[in-house]
Amino acid sequence: MIQIFFLGTGAGSPSKKRKLPAFLVRREGLNILLDCGEGTQYTLMNNKLGINSIKIIGITHMHGDHVFGLLGVIASMGLLDRKETLYILGPRDLKDFLYTSFEYSKFNPSFKIEFIDNYNDQNITIATFKTCHTVESQGYLISERDRVKIDEEKLEKEKIKDWRVMRKLKEGKTVEYNGKFLKPEDYLVIKRGLKVAYTGDTIPCQSVIESVKGVDLLIHDSTFLNEPSAFTYGHSNVADAAKVALEASVKLLALTHISPRYEDVTEHLKVARRIFPKSILPDDLSYITLK
């Protein structure tokens, strides 16, 4: 199970309805923050989302609406006496930006900060992919590892209830049971891991489409409803995001990075759903659960 909290779904500058980009991804105790617009620490604390429980932060690019909240989050972690290592992924300039800011603000973190290119553990991987913006930018693909499960329905049908048999089958061993040899490949099924992709700011481009194919959730730049010059600014219109979702055969599309010029987003959803019916436009502080 993966939960995604939409902490900030706006763009450029905050509006009354939408704060700046930030998304919290939770998976069985692992908390990942994607982008960190100004005010993210307040949103995390005010909604009891555990600022010090964040293990990994991924920044898509160095524009202020995506990164200006990072210093505050890290400073608050220090004030809360964090000891655990914080892992950060991001563009090449991010490390210099942070440590220069630490130097001028006389801040010395009480914990280790490690800059990484990707993340792997026994349950999940985080990879980056190239996006197409006006500055160096990258998206994030969070993938659960596939899991092997016992076909309980088949075992029940064959009246096999011995837990020792089940354990050996799951270990990939052939088991003799009531005069019959049970092969693991006949009783094991692969449960496909969930996948979540976040583009940050981007125009629709092939590198994004190829990287997000088949994901369970695509969070895609949808800055404008129908702005002819969207590509000039390195952003997508709603229809662009929907076409990417359609071509990449994703399961669900979340429109985000909504320009503050729009108070009513009813038309955004109508446009998206005409192209890709499984589209949503989350409000700030909404969340979804993938299973």
UniProtKB/Swiss-Prot annotation:
Cofactor remark: Binds 2 Zn(2+) ions.
Superkingdom of origin organism: Archaea
Keyword set, alphabetical order: Endonuclease, Hydrolase, Metal-binding, Nuclease, tRNA processing, Zinc
GO molecular function, a single term: 3'-tRNA processing endoribonuclease activity
Entries under InterPro entries matching the protein: Metallo-B-lactamas, RibonucZ/Hydroxyglut_hydro, RNase_Z/BN
Ligand binding (Zn(2+) 2): D65, H66, D201, H257
Binding positions (Zn(2+) 1): H61, H63, H133, D201
Transmembrane segments: none
Reaction equation(s) it catalyzes: Endonucleolytic cleavage of RNA, removing extra 3' nucleotides from tRNA precursor, generating 3' termini of tRNAs. A 3'-hydroxy group is left at the tRNA terminus and a 5'-phosphoryl group is left at the trailer molecule
Its EC number(s): 3.1.26.11
Function: Zinc phosphodiesterase, which displays some tRNA 3'-processing endonuclease activity. Probably involved in tRNA maturation, by removing a 3'-trailer from precursor tRNA.
UniProt record similarity statement: Belongs to the RNase Z family.
Protein name, entry field: Ribonuclease Z
